[in-house]
Amino acid sequence: IFDCTTYLHYKDNDPTLPYIVESGRENYEFCNITSSSFLDLHLDLSDKASPFRFTLPKLEILADSFKKQGIGSDYHVILYSRNGAQWSARIWWMLRAVGFDQASILDGGFNQWQKMNLPTSKGNLTFSKSDFIFSPRDNIFVDKDAVHEAMNNPKCIILNSLTSDIHNGKNPRYGRLGRIPTSLNI
């Protein structure tokens, strides 16, 4: 079981500083689902050389990071996050990209777990390094060239899951107004 929480703190409307990233580790250590560990998307599972936040690292590096966290072929992994499932969903996709399918997302996440008064603990649990069978799926994430092709392909749909004000170009939160042409907002 892994807590995957990351917090984005929006400080102002300056598009050059859209948000500050904070690891959820401190809240995890204060109170977590019993027997869970923590996966830090920003510090441990992103490409540190990229100028962009949360960039997917090379798949070999990502697989090695998961292996070091104790994720391996002998286990089923349950992911959860606080205040929504976006962070656990992101890591679920990352696991699939390196060929790991034995993962689920906790319905309702940590917030629902607490509301149900289910067991929680304090502290930081770590798991031993595990055997991880690396089987990359290069088609799970696409690059800008694939997106350009999809924009001109009537059989492809590009979905944007950001808020409608960002999608419609009314909120400069990410520094550049607008959306990918032909994308639909959900």
What spans do the regions from the language model cover?
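Cytosolic catalytic domains that perform sulfur/thiol-centered chemistry
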Residues: 1-186
